[in-house]
Amino acid sequence: MQEQYRPEEIESKVQLHWDEKRTFEVTEDESKEKYYCLSMLPYPSGRLHMGHVRNYTIGDVIARYQRMLGKNVLQPIGWDAFGLPAEGAAVKNNTAPAPWTYDNIAYMKNQLKMLGFGYDWSRELATCTPEYYRWEQKFFTELYKKGLVYKKTSAVNWCPNDQTVLANEQVIDGCCWRCDTKVERKEIPQWFIKITAYADELLNDLDKLDHWPDTVKTMQRNWIGRSEGVEITFNVNDYDNTLTVYTTRPDTFMGCTYLAVAAGHPLAQKAAENNPELAAFIDECRNTKVAEAEMATMEKKGVNTGFKAVHPLTGEEIPVWAANFVLMEYGTGAVMAVPGHDQRDYEFASKYGLNIKPVILAADGSEPDLSQQALTEKGVLFNSGEFNGLDHEAAFNAIADKLTAMGVGERKVNYRLRDWGVSRQRYWGAPIPMVTLEDGTVMPTPDDQLPVILPEDVVMDGITSPIKADPQWAKTTVNGMPALRETDTFDTFMESSWYYARYTCPEYKEGMLDSEAANYWLPVDIYIGGIEHAIMHLLYFRFFHKLMRDAGMVNSDEPAKQLLCQGMVLADAFYYVGENGERNWVSPVDAIVERDEKGRIVKAKDAAGHELVYTGMSKMSKSKNNGIDPQVMVERYGADTVRLFMMFASPADMTLEWQESGVEGANRFLKRVWKLVYEHTAKGDVAALNVDALTEDQKALRRDVHKTIAKVTDDIGRRQTFNTAIAAIMELMNKLAKAPTDGEQDRALMQEALLAVVRMLNPFTPHICFTLWQELKGEGDIDNAPWPVADEKAMVEDSTLVVVQVNGKVRAKITVPVDATEEQVRERAGQEHLVAKYLDGVTVRKVIYVPGKLLNLVVG
């Protein structure tokens, strides 16, 4: 064994061994308990970033640990390979998205291997290959036949820069989430999948997900947004149609003083024909689409349509306004306004001088003061005719019943969730498998024409999709009739909604899934990824699983038992102000810093001498130029060091602050482990451990070894607090470094301890552990070695610490044998100087003894 730890030599050797032996390739084995560990698949952007490294290290630690428990562990990897960035990069680099993507996959695959992740590479898949997306296309046609897919023209969020549709979730502050361009509204035909048909199940089954973070479940609950209320129909004077509104507060109905409709509502359009102010307002609304999240904070604006609706219970005429806070795609595109009891309605009414009528009493039974704000709490009705005196629930039911009896109301369950629009006007995605015949009939692409292959040899102009620009591509024939293919492609969330299931049978050619293999491995035991996916990917992922279940492919209700959302990786961020006042961000690698005595950065400059402004730690990003290249760190310190730092620096679900000093610390620790094994093995063979012949000190050290095994097992397995597991191993290493190594049993004990340490570290730092296991002559490869088991007998304490009090005040702490009697403990306590001086010349009136813990002497 060489004396120095040289990761650059051992890591490549061990990785080659894994490749040659196909160590991590698995097949279904009914005799073994399975464990499916999955990290969210990466987008092949070109290089791994530290966020990837953190996600995949957590997954690999869990997978290797479960493997050492004797389970049949599947840990696959693949590439979420379609998507917009490839198109931009292709234009910029004068290439096509396909070669750019495949080059990136090859490069990033090497990076993943360099980090030593134990993946089953035989199952690798890329979602941009026809072998993958053909089954997605086939499944889509099946959903169409079941009535779960439809096409309709809808107002969409359009990014003029990316030339594509954005989901509501992808609009942030009225701008595109990707390129920050102002989003426009546009009407285009789109394909939708009926996720709303599964809304109740998606909501109710959240209760089955005991091992998902509450934050994610709450976000999904709110996104699905189930509510119970009443749909109410109003007659409108001089208008051919009625207006329907939905309310969850029918108890406030007697306080409704105006209605508000969306700018796109037919009533507003009709009124605008003779109202230039309203027409201009509608245009303004059309061009300033906001995501629902911004609704609460934006300025509320409106224009009176001139129409009057009739309140069905009071007969009063109330004005109908067009307002920018009503969305056409939510509910009916019209809302009833109760300014006395809804703050938004109150602000709007105050701004435009509309009537505010209170109908709910304050909590103390007095009439509410509405001079400053609405009273939004529920309470007892007044000012409401026959409903006066009713509380919220009674009023809800009484008013709902009355409206229903009159034929102008109906109880309804509503959802915020909208159907999933899956059409994208981009090229680099899976073609949507639908065709339009000459007579206008729309139908699914026949099975014998699947997959509809996306041509990869294309020229990108950066504006129009090549399959839209080439009229020949769309031409086909169906049943001998000319037809045109759909030229939109799928939202890339389609591919990432079912990849986890395809990993169970990536070579299967008879269909989307081999049910036998899928049902052996599914559901996923732990799924690891960022919380930013809570409402898009993780909802579609659950939805797709239910669709596949209902198609008879899988027999479970949910795709993943546990979800672990890893925290972000942060790094120092610095900038200097340029000549034009712009911020020039400087990489932390290039910043020369001065720190105070507490290690805080007080001054910084770059190599060119610019004084730098330090903005603190923030998420690693291109925009702040504060990303740290994992490859540089691996080349400098080795993969094991980077992995160990990632798992030690912070709990897995919390943010991690990148500190190179911490990486250096992890590297020093691994050098110490190497050195201890080197010194131990240099002394030659080791005798068998005889536990009965150990001295008290040896027993104490062995107790520490086995207590550490117990703690690390609990920390990795049950608690998933990997940082505390590493801390416990480090603490044990400190004790082992000081332990005597001269005697035969000293060395035998050291052998047992080091074999345990190397196995406990193996999930975190597999290359060094593989090598040290061989040097320690462990049985076989460490990859097949069992996890160490704590010896209960070894952990039994011979002695215990007893706190000694005199009149309730702690005077000493004494160590006594665990089987010591009360008399022996009292005798031992009396020998302590600090106890004896308080007993001198006084009488012990009472003794309180809690065996093995506390002795309290009451004196007087």
From Swiss-Prot:
Catalytic activity field: tRNA(Leu) + L-leucine + ATP = L-leucyl-tRNA(Leu) + AMP + diphosphate
Signal peptide: none
Subcellular location field: Cytoplasm
GO biological process, one term: leucyl-tRNA aminoacylation
Record-given protein name: Leucine--tRNA ligase
Lineage of origin: Bacteria, Pseudomonadati, Pseudomonadota, Gammaproteobacteria, Enterobacterales
Enzyme Commission (EC) number: 6.1.1.4
Species this chain originates from: Escherichia coli O157:H7
Top-level taxon in the UniProt lineage: Bacteria
Renumbered ranges of motif 'HIGH' region: 42-52
